[in-house]
Amino acid sequence: MSNLPIINFINFNQNGSCISMGTSQGFKIFNCEPFGRFYQDEEGGCGIVEMLFSTSLLAVVGMGDNPAMSPRRLRMLNTKRHSVICEVTFPTTILSVKMNKSRLAVLLQEQIYIYDISNMRLLHTIETSMNAQGIMSMSPNSENNYLVYPSPPKVINSEIKDHATTNNINIKKTDAVDDTIKKDYSLQVPSDITGQQQQQQPGVDPATSNNTANKIIKNGDVIVFNLQTLQPTMVIEAHKGEIAALKLSADGTLLATASEKGTIIRVFNVENGSKVYQFRRGTYPTKISSLSFSKDNQFLAVCSSSKTVHIFKLGKNTVDNKSNELNSDDEIEDDLVPRYGDEDEEDEEIDEEATSINSNHSSKEPVVDAKRSTVGRMIRKSSQRLSRKAARTLGAYFPIKVSSILEPSRHFASLKITTSSNQPIKAIAAIDDPIELSIKEYPDLFEKNASNNGDYQNSDTLTMVPIRVVSSEGFMYKYISDPERGGDCILLEQYSLLSD
């Protein structure tokens, strides 16, 4: 086991049909269906290996094992001819590479270089803030040709004075009155929680410290950049905290986002920036490693460091109505509970976790098959019953829109990656088109679930959605999920990406 290479990079191609993997020895390319390795190179460690759909074009960045494999050098390879098409060297380390059939984007720590992929001509350079995690996403669709990346942090000055009270609020009429107000503020010394007056620390300017305390750093915005016009189109206010993951849908119309906290997943309309879905992944913070849409935008897969993949069902809801009502809920929430600092951001995220879109559910409303009994589900049911009871009780005292905040929107299906390691892992999922599965081919597999689902016994074939997951441990898992009932996904196949 010690001779196995170290995995530096792993990803699906744009349509989820292939897997590219960079290791300490080189890189490998796999086909998903049927599974098998069809290309391998061992010239040196690779940190980035990106494919252009299922073509022979590869974008490869080395790990610095030798001068030819510098982490600052991008190599465009043709796997059919086993040749290097071109090489481009950048001033700093390359953190991410994304491409579609018309554009190629190279992300450095503080710049994004955009090229015409047909001739590798530099079209534009974007100056950004520090993006050490290499977070960006490009639309695979050349018609809705967008690039998204985190916006530079914004400093917001709070209008609330730290020691202001309702006893000294005055209406500003003249400069003299303004001077009086300033004097009043400067004379006041707030009391601490013990009731004793706080002493000013030597060498600290009260005015400076107050200005610093009243500043809030907002770093949860996302910039949408049009790769055709080479202009930014909008800034989406996605989260309060730092962005951890971004993903554009296959058609480039939807954007999924997650913050560092990892409890809330949001989906936005790329055309107008409106929020169309909001999902609660869980209660406890976790690191989101990837987001991925199905090709038809019906499902969204969220992979986290807790080795769990949550599947959310988006359905075909009306975007405008949903976004308007969600925005109204946000306004109500902001009016009810004003927030002014980092200390309250966690509470705000918890409140926002409960923001519901239940009042907008279409006929495609996610339904989890309640007949499937598991210990985890019984525990969740008990917890959810208490939550709903509390929501109904509190909802009786609030307006309809406010009470809707109390009902969370949960995942439609989920799976737990099978691993013996106790360490956090990174995973990426790809949701394929539905398939017809013969029960006779997998009798043992469906026998375990037949007792909890009568439909398995009354038909020869089942319509299932394949979900492929690749992990940083070097495995590819193929799960299947019921597109109507959801629930626990069933493991169908498992392969090692490291073994020969």
From Swiss-Prot:
Family membership noted in the UniProt record: Belongs to the WD repeat PROPPIN family.
Record keywords, A-Z: Autophagy, Endosome, Membrane, Protein transport, Repeat, Transport, Vacuole, WD repeat
Entry keyword annotation includes Zinc: no
Name of the featured protein: Autophagy-related protein 18
Pfam families per the UniProt record, alphabetical: PROPPIN
Residue numbers covered by motif L/FRRG motif: 279-283
Gene coding for it: ATG18
Subunit structure: Component of the PI(3,5)P2 regulatory complex.
